[in-house]
Each structure stands twice: as structure tokens, then as C-alpha cells.
Amino acid sequence: MLPLTLLNATQGRPILVELKNGETFNGHLENCDNYMNLTLREVIRTMPDGDKFFRLPECYIRGNNIKYLRIQDEVLSQVAKQQAQQRENRGSRFRGRGQRGRGNYGHTAPNRRGRGRGGHM
């Protein structure tokens, strides 16, 4: 599973984010982008030593600072089911297309040289 797929499925749900500097943020995921930048709401920020807590209405976390993400187990199972279903649907779409190959496609014309860029003989 790709992390962005999981993050998109987690929007609106609780998430724990640990940064490289040791700070942790607990809140509800509001938004994420392709760089894994996150916007959280109703956030509790914990300092690395664990002795200071801050309550924030909203915060923005830059993706390159993220060390660890923890999401709910039900989100993991939900995304796994969706991806399995997509794989099944994808498999039946292209059945029977690999028989042609390259060449004259059943025409009976004699084998001719391509028309390329000149090179007449």
C-alpha cells in the first residue's frame, strides 16, 4: 500500500504524527498533499521530553519532517479491501488482447520493406 493512499483514506479520522525532532502531534487529519504535507485539527502537541503539552485548534506539518505515522487499524483493512477489489476489476478488462502480435495482422500481402526515410534499392 502506498502511504498517500492510506493518508487519503484517513482524512477526517484520528492520526498520530511523530516528527524527526521527537515531537508528537495527535489530531484529526484534515488534508494531505502529494508531498505528505499534513493539516491536522483539534491537535495535542507533545514535546520530545514528554513534559509539555499544547492544545492547538489546527496545525500544518511539512512532509519532510515526518518520521512516523500511526493510523487506525480499520483504515488499513478498508484500504486493503479496496485495492484487492480494484485488482480484480483491472484483471478482467484486458482479456483476449494478447493474440495479435506484430506484423501483417492476417493480411495476405507479400512482405514489403517499410517506407522509412528513403533508402530505395
Curated annotation (Swiss-Prot):
Any one GO CC term of the record: U6 snRNP
The keyword Nucleotide-binding appears for this protein: no
InterPro entries: Lsm4, LSm4/Sm_D1/D3, LSM_dom_sf, Sm, Sm_dom_euk/arc
Composition bias, Basic residues: 110-121
Top-level taxon of the source organism: Eukaryota
Residues covered by the Sm domain: 2-75
UniProt key word Cytoplasm: yes
Transmembrane feature ranges: none
Compartment annotation: Nucleus; Cytoplasm
Alphabetized Gene3D superfamilies for the sequence: 2.30.30.100
GO biological process, any: RNA folding
MF GO annotations: U2 snRNA binding; U6 snRNA binding
Region (Disordered): 82-121
Keywords recorded for this protein, A-Z: Cytoplasm, mRNA processing, mRNA splicing, Nucleus, Ribonucleoprotein, RNA-binding, Spliceosome
Function summary: Component of LSm protein complexes, which are involved in RNA processing and may function in a chaperone-like manner. Component of the cytoplasmic LSM1-LSM7 complex which is involved in mRNA degradation by activating the decapping step. The LSM1-LSM7 complex loads onto the 3'-end of single stranded RNA. Component of the nuclear LSM2-LSM8 complex, which is involved in spliceosome assembly. The LSM2-LSM8 complex plays a role in the biogenesis of the spliceosomal U4/U6-U5 tri-snRNP complex by accelerating prp24-mediated annealing of U4/U6 di-snRNA.
Quaternary organization: Component of the heptameric LSM1-LSM7 complex that forms a seven-membered ring structure with a donut shape. The LSm subunits are arranged in the order lsm1, lsm2, lsm3, lsm6, lsm5, lsm7 and lsm4. Component of the heptameric LSM2-LSM8 complex that forms a seven-membered ring structure with a donut shape. The LSm subunits are arranged in the order lsm8, lsm2, lsm3, lsm6, lsm5, lsm7 and lsm4.
Entry similarity comment: Belongs to the snRNP Sm proteins family.
Identification of the protein by name: LSM complex subunit lsm4
Biological source species: Schizosaccharomyces pombe (strain 972 / ATCC 24843)
